[in-house]
Amino acid sequence: MVKEKRRLNHRGTQGLTIVGECLRSRLLHNSSSYRFNVINSLLERKIEKRPDKVRLQGRILFLTEDPELIKRQLAGEDLPWDTKNPANNPKLRDDISTDEITPAHYCFYFDETLGEIPYLGLKCGSVTPIGRGEVKRGGFVCAVSGKRRGKGSSREQSPYAEMCAGIQVVIAENIERIYKQNCQNLGVLTSTDFSLIDRIRGGEEIPLSEFTAGEDEITRQVIEYGGLFPFNVARMQKKVTLPPIENIAKLEMAGNVRRYAAPPMTLAEKIFARHMLNENGEVGVAAVKPGDTGFAQADLRFSHEYVTPMAAIFFERYVGKDAKVNDASSIIFFRDHLTFLDEVISEEKKKLGLLDLATQLKFKQQDFAAKQGIKLHGELKDRKGSEGICHSIVLESYALPGQLNIGSDSHTPHVGAIGCVAFGIGTTDVFNSWITKDVRVKVPESVRILIRGKKRENVTAKDFILKILSLDYVRSGKALAKVMEYAGEAIEELSVDERSTMTNMAAEIGGFTGIVAPDKKAVDFLVERRGMDRNKAQSMIAGLYSDADAQYAHVIELNAAEITPMVATPGDPGNGKYVRELNTPVPVEIAYGGTCTAGKNEDMDMYAAVLADALKRGKRVADSVKFYIQFGSQETRDYCLRKGYLDVFQKAGAHVIEPSCGACINAGPGVSTRPDQVVISAQNRNFPGRSGPGQMYLASPFTVAASAVAGYIVEYEPNEKKELVEA
């Protein structure tokens, strides 16, 4: 065997200078209308870099655990901060979610009004210390917090609200990927360097390089140009350089046959390699490795009514009111988040005009879709509800193994269950992808999560992911921006529906995406649920696996047999605890089964199994509990109709709801209305204020349904080893 190394796709200096020409050629080839309507106008646009030094004039807001310290800052006091002796400083809030930065109802704004909103949902203990407009009036230019800032939703309204309130710099111990990228795309600076605090307060001119240190070459230039859109215009004008992807291939001799073999790669790396653009603007390179940066062409781009209107406004403002998107056939819009908002929004919020604003989101998306010729999965014609949640429909009808998909939602990794790389992006990434059909990517490291052995009968994928979320490796932020690759015998036994629960909740881990290597179960899914020819489906998954010598940043191993039903206690999905570890019975008032995570066919099997068991024993949903079951899509509703589940749900006392994100986004039946109200939900996150003011526990469909019958949180015992006693 003879081996030598050869560099493929090496650009060199000439390659660096032709990147803009390649992008222009590719766009012009994709759509002739771009020649006149978009590209020429952008090529004439004047684009300049921001100054190479930054001087901030204003105050610093420390987001502390102590609400009184925050109130004192809002009243005008500048909090002392000892950068040399951090132990002397008050504790900063960790795990600040985008739900806290911009609570869902205020995301109905998509203009500078958001500057009145930042941190309205921030909870310090039981107190929300920041009122509307107080950050903006306080003259703050920098906000400081602890670990995992910006976790949760991909909503770009959060950094946009901060920016409109005057915040120019965000400092935290570590920062979630999507939130950080949204900040960079908008021009908000981010850092994990706490020594900047004294320098900002001292009015020092800080080199911009302090904020680009450690970033890849593309991100550095995005920051230097003040955001993604000006960077992309500069990219078309040949003013920027893209780093070469230097793929090393080995020449192997097998008899008389010479071939170049790519180095070992993970499944995700293989898919990235298929989609990265080379120096000629062509799609695909021989291999990639973690840290490689560039642009990847997306097979599918989608967004929903929370994001599409803001992206459309940006597109019309910066590109042109009459400009057309690039390849409308690969873009999909969804009306899924706010379908039932009118049933739960408070009178106070109605008086603020928020319901009217939410309706405008719907109309703006409809109008933009019609104008651009983009497919919109909207509301039902004959009854209230949506066609389905975006993630549910994308898995049921669109995503394919080996694809690279991007969506305006943090739970876009849902479809990784059939072996595609799918990840969430923010508004600016969305509208830029409408121009370029690609997305900037830094190839992430992968974490291999092996779940060995055989699971218990009452344990589900949701219990697995809640266990993973409770691990120190995840809670400390070490998994941030990495691919979660799930494998092992217990994963292989899971259906595609169950696997999607785990890939979906890679978002709660803070991962880049989640993925499972496609196998016979993925093929069966494509054949049985999509009607695809089996040979075609089988050929589609060829080569989609991680190589034996692929490199991982970390490996997590769990024994499925040791995992029992779990809950995440209120406040964070990482607060995992076994149900049997709850010290006292926890009565519940609301049980909720639904959302993209738990509104699938197999989730309905679980709700129906528990309720059918209860009916056999003469029991129903406890009188003290309201149990809501919401379908993820019309396909799942039809499945329940065929299986006879609707009758079971009705007889057992559950309330059935047509598809929508609903309670998970504080916009439908199942939300809490009082701080002391206890909810058990099969949704994916329970950040403060996410689904109302109450105390939310996360659990599996089995546990949610069993608790609805019992009246308090219990494990489901399929063999009736334990009698459910109504509270």
List each language-model region with its residue ranges.
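Fe-S-dependent hydro-lyases/dehydratases of central metabolism
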Residues: 1-7, 12-727
